[in-house]
Amino acid sequence: MSRILKPVAAQDVKYLHQICAQYFMGERAFRIAEYNLGNTFTGSIDLLASDDTTVYLITINIADFADALLRAFTGYRWFRENRDFLQRIYPPEVIDIGLQVQLIILSQDFPPEIPSIVDEVCSVPVGLYRYRLFGSAQDPDIFIEEIQRPGKTLPFQDEEPDTLRTRLGIEAANLSDDDIREFLSAMRA
């Protein structure tokens, strides 16, 4: 018997920010320095994060993608204009504001042409991540995957279902090989 996970809508924006931050800390080893930096008029950043080489300005879309794209760009402009000020506020051991910058946009849906557009138009790297919320609206679970650019290989593309079960720690779910393949293809669609 397969367990059906039903998509749910985000009810609590702060909670969505927290679970996205947990993903980036756990899966990408980012350090989160700040939540909700800036404001809607001059530019805002949902999550200010970094690793050893890059500062990430993360925008989490809960509505229209065009609005999220504009928020990401105005947040980047605000960050650039206030970089000296931010370096005085945040000590380097918390976040090194002088590192290279990458924008990250999380969204449930993307226009199909957006990866090639941001690659061609933007002077700063832009990472695109799709997220899905499952479970209940009061306590959702999240699935996040990076949108692959042409020429990149998809994660788990060539792995056998048994290898994936072990790697993802889902042996106890008793999912069949077909269930795993179906889920992966649905998430990539």
Question: What residues fall within each predicted segment?
Answer:
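Charged, terminal alpha-helix-loop-beta segments
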Residues: 1-189
